[in-house]
């Protein structure tokens, strides 16, 4: 490909609305342009990268025996109502009506559609296991699209679904897909960490996210360097060191705390650690009011809470709603379970520890409050607090380390959630009808592209892994006159005829402009012929990743091809 025949709109300046490297560099390198909030045009260079990522995904999926499909993006509301997710998906799902007043969704995922399609096609255990996938545009009405294509409203996703006669078969495919995902991301040049995760509205018994450690990540990962445990903080069980204080050593008494409502204010006023207090969190869902007590230095984990109570969402109670429960806003004391509100105590609390708690009276707290003595019918404690760095590993009790991460893939064991909803059954070996169990496996294609940039950039621009670079080799020619141009074209044709992906920058612009563009875009290998070549036969080959250039005297095309191919193989080997 010749640059003179290509669209190459590189930019010197960063876009004003870009706050992360991938967004800045995708625009500056001419890979994409913004359409509107969360929507992007892909230009030829960017599209080539996406196509290469898709091809890697397709190759590895096909190796597992998965079959590729193509389903409609527009999905009827009947499918979603049958699974119970027409409401559960909330405002993030785009919903539309046609001229006949029939409701549809722009598919954010396709469990329902594949279940509907495959139900009449699966008759017997002999048809199983079946693993199906597609690579398709999805839609999500993000409340705050951000970070360029990392969190957008339209995106390309590889979504796969597997169907099984039992959980043993499901686990075999799950592990096969887990291995395939590691291979896919390795080939794309990404270092990923599989972490235990919350399944959210997808449902199911287990899931893992494939995370890339990055300071711009929106997820918090908790990792154990001792045993290798890894989990999203949303999923991590909280394990704390027990406080060794006798309840008899602290006298119970009420103390004045004028105007001190928050844990921070109370702790500072009384000069005590926040961990010796109890905080109350008041919430409501569509069906119930919720009152959660946890240790004062901890935060409530809404994902754990929603999963425990099997609710989709929650929001804070108003002061009026709190008062209706006989409680004082800002000064809520621990209470026993009752019919008015769902009461939960987090397992960060100790039954026999003397805490400082609010007194359910304006401007007063109580010290020496022991839960097992003061709260009748104390319920079993639940794990609803957010685990943090320094808390103990649930496997080996070593301290956990926190990292920020970007999710590029997610795999689920869905169980029978969708197969039951759609009545998908087959006859087993004994002629008995069995409800199938499912798995689900997703990869964000655009997000993978952006995350590679986040991991592989420097002050000059991007350095693509050779496997997904828009072109493997760029030929930069600095010529004067038709004779020199013709010689450069000979180099281009020779390289191209060796089945190398070559981008020839033959534009009539200055050499500095060409060299900077090649480094900004991130072509893995650059061959430069210019003044030194035409004077004394000197050529240079530049390794973008290593930022290293080697010059040598041209000794024929065979020698040049050998040098380029050697570097090419070296760059591919780094991805294995």
Swiss-Prot record:
It is found in: Cytoplasm. InterPro entries: aa-tRNA-synt_IIb, aa-tRNA-synth_II, aa-tRNA-synth_II/BPL/LPL, Anticodon-bd, Anticodon-bd_dom_sf, Pro-tRNA-ligase_IIa, Pro-tRNA-synth_IIa_bac-type, Pro-tRNA-Synthase_IIa_type1. Consists of three domains: the N-terminal catalytic domain, the editing domain and the C-terminal anticodon-binding domain. It comes from Leptospira borgpetersenii serovar Hardjo-bovis (strain JB197). GO terms for biological process: prolyl-tRNA aminoacylation. GO terms for molecular function: aminoacyl-tRNA deacylase activity; ATP binding; proline-tRNA ligase activity. The keyword Ligase applies. Catalyzes the attachment of proline to tRNA(Pro) in a two-step reaction: proline is first activated by ATP to form Pro-AMP and then transferred to the acceptor end of tRNA(Pro). As ProRS can inadvertently accommodate and process non-cognate amino acids such as alanine and cysteine, to avoid such errors it has two additional distinct editing activities against alanine. One activity is designated as 'pretransfer' editing and involves the tRNA(Pro)-independent hydrolysis of activated Ala-AMP. Its EC number is 6.1.1.15. Homodimer. Pfam families: HGTP_anticodon, tRNA-synt_2b, tRNA_edit. Gene3D superfamilies: Anticodon-binding domain (3.40.50.800), Bira Bifunctional Protein, Domain 2 (3.30.930.10). Belongs to the class-II aminoacyl-tRNA synthetase family. ProS type 1 subfamily. Keywords: Aminoacyl-tRNA synthetase, ATP-binding, Cytoplasm, Ligase, Nucleotide-binding, Protein biosynthesis. Its main location: cytoplasm. HAMAP family: Pro_tRNA_synth_type1 (MF_01569). This is Proline--tRNA ligase. GO terms for cellular component: cytosol. It catalyses: tRNA(Pro) + L-proline + ATP = L-prolyl-tRNA(Pro) + AMP + diphosphate.
């Amino acid at each position: 490909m010749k640059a003179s025949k290509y669209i190459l709109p590189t930019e010197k300046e960063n876009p004003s609305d870009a706050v992360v490297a991938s967004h800045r560099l995708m625009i500056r390198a001419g890979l994409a342009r913004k359409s509107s909030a969360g929507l992007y045009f892909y230009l030829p260079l960017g599209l080539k990268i996406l196509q290469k990522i898709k091809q890697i995904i397709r190759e590895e999926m096909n190796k597992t025996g998965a079959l590729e499909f193509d389903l409609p993006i527009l999905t009827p509301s009947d499918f979603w109502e049958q699974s119970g997710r027409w409401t559960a998906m909330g405002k993030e799902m785009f919903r539309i009506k046609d001229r006949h007043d029939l409701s549809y969704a722009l598919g954010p995922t396709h469990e329902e559609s594949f279940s509907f399609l495959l139900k009449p096609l699966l008759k017997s255990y002999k048809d199983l296991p079946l693993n199906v996938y597609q690579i398709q545009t999805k839609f999500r009405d993000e409340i705050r699209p951000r970070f360029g294509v990392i969190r957008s409203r339209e995106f390309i996703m590889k979504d796969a679904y597997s169907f099984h006669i039992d959980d043993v078969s499901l686990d075999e495919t799950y592990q096969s897909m887990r291995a395939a995902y590691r291979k896919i991301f390795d080939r794309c040049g990404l270092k990923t960490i599989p972490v235990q995760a919350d399944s959210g509205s997808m449902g199911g018994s287990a899931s893992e996210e494939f995370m890339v450690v990055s300071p711009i990540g929106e997820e918090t990962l908790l990792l154990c360097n001792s045993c290798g445990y890894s989990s999203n903080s949303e999923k991590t069980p909280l394990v704390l060191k027990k406080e060794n204080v006798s309840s008899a050593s602290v006298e119970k008494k009420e103390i004045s705390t004028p105007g001190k409502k928050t844990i921070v204010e109370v702790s500072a006023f009384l000069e005590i650690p926040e961990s010796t207090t109890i905080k109350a969190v008041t919430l409501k869902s569509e069906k119930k009011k919720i009152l959660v007590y946890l240790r004062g230095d901890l935060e409530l984990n809404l994902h754990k809470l929603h999963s425990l109570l099997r609710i989709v969402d929650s929001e804070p109670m108003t002061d009026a709603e709190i008062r209706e429960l006989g409680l004082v806003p800002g000064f809520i004391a621990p209470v026993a379970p009752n019919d008015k509100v769902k009461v939960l105590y987090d397992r960060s609390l100790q039954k026999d520890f003397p805490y400082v708690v609010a007194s359910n009276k304006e401007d007063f707290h109580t010290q020496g409050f022991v839960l097992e003595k003061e709260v009748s019918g104390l319920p079993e404690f639940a794990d609803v607090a957010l685990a943090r760095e320094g808390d103990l590993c649930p496997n080996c009790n070593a301290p956990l380390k926190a990292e920020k991460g970007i999710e590029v893939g997610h795999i689920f064991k869905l169980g029978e959630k969708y197969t039951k909803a759609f009545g998908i059954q087959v006859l087993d070996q004994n002629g008995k009808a069995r409800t199938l169990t499912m798995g689900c496996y997703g990869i964000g294609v655009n997000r993978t592209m952006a995350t590679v940039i986040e991991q592989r950039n420097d002050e000059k621009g991007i350095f693509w892994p050779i496997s997904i670079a828009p072109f493997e080799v760029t030929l930069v020619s600095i010529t004067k006159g038709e004779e020199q141009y013709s010689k450069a074209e000979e180099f281009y044709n020779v390289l191209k005829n060796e089945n190398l992906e070559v981008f020839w920058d033959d534009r009539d612009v200055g050499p500095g402009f060409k060299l900077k563009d090649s480094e900004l875009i991130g072509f893995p290998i650059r061959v430069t012929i210019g003044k030194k070549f035409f004077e004394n036969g000197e050529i240079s080959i530049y390794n973008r990743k290593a930022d290293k250039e080697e010059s040598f005297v041209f000794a024929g095309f065979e020698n040049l091809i050998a040098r380029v191919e050697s570097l090419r193989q070296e760059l591919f080997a780094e991805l294995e």
